[in-house]
Swiss-Prot record:
The keyword Transferase applies. Keywords: Cytoplasm, Methyltransferase, RNA-binding, rRNA processing, S-adenosyl-L-methionine, Transferase. It is found in: Cytoplasm. It is an enzyme of class 2 (transferase). S-adenosyl-L-methionine binds at residues 31, 33, 58, 79, 104, 129. It catalyses: adenosine(1518)/adenosine(1519) in 16S rRNA + 4 S-adenosyl-L-methionine = N(6)-dimethyladenosine(1518)/N(6)-dimethyladenosine(1519) in 16S rRNA + 4 S-adenosyl-L-homocysteine + 4 H(+). Pfam families: RrnaAD. One of its GO terms (cellular component) is cytosol. It comes from Staphylococcus aureus (strain Newman). This is Ribosomal RNA small subunit methyltransferase A. The gene is rsmA.
Length: 297
């Protein structure tokens, strides 16, 4: 069993890896945090307290997990790599408020796990250094399930984080921005250098905060259909929405006039590009489309 010193230092991380003969798997995007200051910034941004339940994805050797355990009521961590379970049993042995589930977060029954382990928590936050290769599927999977999550403070590839937080009209703004901002209010916490990881990743990192909205930003009757319609506007970013929707709809080329009429009734200039349309603009398009049964996809 380890003593109560912080895990997130180069020397202690290396000692743990040597003790267990652990080798990093590139395919799992394993990069462990070795800077306690960064972890403290993440904890501070999370606003967790003794009544908070935390979901962590990819705890690794427990560098962030131990700090979460010191601040939160309970921590529920999902770790896909079986080789790390003995390490976590060691590093987290001082804490009786942590449950580690050895399962792929994209295949796990998260709702059931939350009901079993975090049911007595007043607030639930997702706090994690996410595996960069599956950041987007993880976030969308959590947001689109009926799980009572209040917010997320998550580390990810800088480029992806900038897309989540992008403003209308910016180069980074796209369909991912729309989905995430539909569900949450987004903000940047801090940029993280490569040097605070072992091994250093190939990309720069960012921590973002996403707080769940009490109500989605706009009201639509079918979220999946709404997101598909919005995504189609970005199919070819250099093309106008008129061109993109002609390619998106079945027989769109034969319905050019109908598409123009639809855009006009929604108050959207057909010469605009997808990146200039707000979520509210896409909601107008979605509602107006119901008046044009010819526009199928």
């Amino acid at each position: 069993m380890l003593d109560n010193k912080d895990i997130a230092t180069p020397s202690r991380t290396r000692a743990l890896l040597d003790k267990y003969g652990f080798n990093f798997k590139k395919s799992l995007g394993q990069n462990f945090l070795i800077d306690v200051n960064i972890i403290n910034n993440i904890i501070d941004a999370s606003d967790i307290d003794a009544q908070t339940g935390v979901i962590e994805i990819g705890p690794g050797i427990g560098s962030l997990t131990e700090q979460l355990a010191r601040h939160a009521k309970r921590v529920l961590a999902f770790e896909i790599d079986q080789r790390l379970i003995p390490v976590l049993n060691d590093t987290l042995s001082p804490y009786d408020n942590v449950t580690v589930i050895n399962e792929d977060i994209l295949k796990a029954n998260i709702k059931e796990a939350v009901e079993n382990h975090l049911q007595d928590c007043e607030k639930i936050m997702v706090v994690a250094n996410l595996p960069y290769y599956i950041t987007t599927p993880i976030l969308l999977n959590l947001m689109q399930q009926d799980i009572p999550i209040d917010g997320y403070v998550v580390m990810m590839q800088k480029e992806v984080g900038e897309r989540l937080n992008a403003e209308v009209g910016s180069k980074a703004y796209g369909s991912l921005s729309i989905v995430v901002q539909y569900y949450t209010e987004t903000s940047k916490v801090l940029t993280v250098p490569k040097s605070v990881f072992m091994p250093p990743p190939n990309v720069d990192s960012i921590v973002v905060k996403l707080m769940q909205r009490t109500e989605p930003l706009v009201t639509v009757d079918n979220e999946e259909a709404f997101f598909k319609l919005a995504k189609a506007a970005f199919a070819q970013r250099r093309k106008t929405i008129n061109n993109n929707y002609q390619n998106y709809f079945k027989d769109g080329k034969q319905h050019k006039e109908v598409i123009l009429q639809w855009l006009e009734q929604a108050g959207i200039d057909p010469r605009r590009r997808g990146e200039t349309l707000s979520i509210q603009d896409f909601a107008k398009l979605y509602e107006e489309k119901k008046k044009f049964p010819q526009l199928e996809n």
